[in-house]
Amino acid sequence: MTRPTTTQAAAAIPAQPGPRDVTGAAPATPGSDMAPSGSTDGASVIPGAGPAGPRPGERATVRLRDTGEEEPPRYAPEWLQLREPADAAARSYDLLDPLRIRLANLPGRAGGGLVVHDIGCGTGSMGRWLAPRLDGTQHWVLHDRDPYLLHFAAVASPRSAADGSHVTVETRRGDVARLTPDALAGASLVTASALLDVLTREEVGALAAACAGAGCPALLTLSVAGRVELTAPHPLDTEITEAFNAHQRRGGLLGPDAVTAAAEAFTEHGATVRLNPSPWRLGPEDAALTEQWLRGWVGAAVEERPELAERATAYLAERLDACAAGKLRVVVHHTDLLALCRPVDGGA
């Protein structure tokens, strides 16, 4: 499939984070929200915990789930890097023009820069895709609970906007799906990628309320739609898909219902919502991604329905053989959402 050019999209993930060398990102200090480079003490993140001691002028990140228990990172950086070209090709370009128009007409924007909050930024692929497609000076605030991912996102961030204007970044450590309008004070835009489907209905509602309260638009891309097409079709496709979708809904998470819930939540807060499909279209040139996706997709289905194990093992072997032979094509459906919240002072 055709890949649009993305700034630094092919940046390699370092084996270990090195010294921070990013414009606009201050070095870690004792009690800060980033552990010092090379440090393992305190490197694990407690979900729901904000920075131990924010630097002057910084707001603490807001809690997502105050479980009091330590969880492993949600995504491996290698997986995030592997999927980045497919994500870049899939995101909807049709939502960019209405977004640009809204950003140009934000109250106080004339001649000013953009402040973009990227929620659950991972390795920063959203910024690498979007920043070079927007004009004007930009300051990106990257939120994630994993300090390693935050470091990589910062050092691999784009340095210039579409018109050559400067792009700077800062990082905020924490699991931040629940935001408040105060946490978004001064924000021009909130972005997220592949986030909505791992949130609950309450968390999506809180995100919509925060964006509406701050009067900033939200571009939320690549939420799973619950539909997969494989060529050639197989009798087990439907059962695997249904079991995977049920797995996605575990623990009250929205999974494939996320976009509908988010659209309803933003609409209730007076936002204009636009949806566009953003499917992955995977062919022989995407064999590495297809293989990893297949293993995870079938594995989750079997975890949800163990009685599928024997048939699913044969199914996976057959699909992997077709993938290795360059004969498998997959469409994984996603949806992008643009919510144009009303500016807080009643502007355009």
Language-model features: where?
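Conserved Class I S-adenosyl-L-methionine
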Residues: L184, T267, T272-A348
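A conserved beta-strand element that flanks and buttresses the S-adenosyl-L-methionine
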Residues: T191
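Short catalytic micro-motifs in class I SAM-dependent methyltransferases
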Residues: A194-L195
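Class I SAM-dependent methyltransferase Rossmann-like catalytic core
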Residues: T2-P19, P36-G38, G42-G108
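Class I SAM-dependent methyltransferase SAM/SAH-binding core
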Residues: H117, G124-R178
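A short, conserved alpha-helix within the catalytic core of class I
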Residues: V198-C211
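Conserved catalytic/acceptor-binding region of the Class I
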Residues: C216-S278
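Short conserved loop adjoining the S-adenosyl-L-methionine
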Residues: R178-L184
